[in-house]
Amino acid sequence: YIRTISDGQVQVNCYYPQEDENGLVTTIVLPGKSIDYQNSATGDAEFMGKVLEALTKQEQDGILANLTAGQLDVWNGADGCIDNLTILVEGENAGAFTSHKSNYGGTETICYGLRVSAYNLISTGSLNLSDYSVVCHEFLHTLGAPDLYRNGKNGTPVGVWDQMAQVPPTPQYPLVQTRSDLGWLTMPEASVSGDYTLAPATATSGNRAYVLKTQLAEDEYFVVEYRQKKNMGEYDNYVPESGLIVYRVNKAVPDHTNRDGNNYIY
């Protein structure tokens, strides 16, 4: 999915240290119940510290001995940091275990002395609702994409048109503005009268969007893009119809997010 929406510019390499040489998975299960790892007032740092402490103890006790040297070599000699660690928590998508992305600044290390940078906590409850799409959403946070939904469900300024606003079972393309913010696409400005041709957002070449600027606001502009409703199982299957969409972008909004009630994209 990431390779597709980035026009092949981002290739995500996923490593599964719990997978043996025959391709079978022996799940790494941490001791205790999920509530034992629940955040308190100190927040996510406490949760991640407990997870890494439990992993380290399992490693010391030989519980992780099923991991072969060849499997761990995918981490050996890296830059000293695991870019993104995904943790599955069995249970409802609620409270401290609502699926989310966070950064960890602790000094604990695992597997060849590697520190953890970003991590994605994924509840099995959210997987039941949104399938692998929720994994895409949280990993896009790791890559730098902001939330485009409203916290508290107060309005839907973007809706199903961007993966960072709604998470259907099959992921949709992010808006071209989001892909541009991540450095994957450029959006030319339509500054003179004339005929302009848009390639659909799902295309791999051509202009996927045009910017329309106004003299009324320096930090605000409109974006025009063309979306095509796809077949079941394909990205963009959940958009309601094919057609032209126009949205406003306000670069003055802090953190370029809709989450806190302001409209970065509307």
Describe each PLM feature range.
Residues 232-266:
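Intrinsic-disorder/low-complexity accessory segments
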Residues 83-239, 250-252:
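Extracellular hydrolytic enzyme modules, especially secreted metalloproteases
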Residues 1-110:
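Active-site-proximal segments of metallohydrolase catalytic domains
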